UniProtKB/Swiss-Prot annotation:
Snake venom phospholipase A2 (PLA2) that has a strong dose-dependent anticoagulant effect. In vivo, intramuscular and intervenal injection causes muscle necrosis. Induces moderate edema in the mouse foot pad. PLA2 catalyzes the calcium-dependent hydrolysis of the 2-acyl groups in 3-sn-phosphoglycerides. It is found in: Secreted. Its cofactor is Ca(2+). Belongs to the phospholipase A2 family. Group II subfamily. D49 sub-subfamily. GO terms for molecular function: calcium ion binding; calcium-dependent phospholipase A2 activity; phospholipase A2 activity; phospholipid binding; toxin activity. The active site is at H46, D88. Keywords: Blood coagulation cascade inhibiting toxin, Calcium, Disulfide bond, Hemostasis impairing toxin, Hydrolase, Lipid degradation, Lipid metabolism, Metal-binding, Myotoxin, Secreted, Toxin. The keyword Lipid metabolism applies. This is Basic phospholipase A2 9. Disulfide bonds join C26-C114, C28-C43, C42-C94, C48-C122, C49-C87, C56-C80, C74-C85.
Amino acid sequence: SLVQFNKMIKFETRKSGLPFYAAYGCYCGWGGQRPKDATDRCCFVHDCCYGKVAKCNTKWDIYSYSLKSGYITCGKGTWCKEQICECDRVAAECLRRSLSTYKNEYMFYPDSRCREPPEYTC
């Protein structure tokens, strides 16, 4: 669920998903066009991952996971819940690895500036 993903982001980056990632660059949030930096690419990959489990309720399905010893571990559940958890875990870890690229200028980045043709495909 979005609430759980936010907790994973905060665990990994020490930044809350809201406001730091909810509307960052061209992909964090609604997503579209070309990622602005490595942080935004994490969101692109997360969108692609969610696209692979489109039949699942990615925004609201509550899954099992734990945050221990610096690691996120996804628990057992339905196929959908396990896949959503993995998408969120991988994205949160990617955001941590990309902290050095985070630019405040991309917070609340206007969609109107995300018009370049896509550079990547899922």
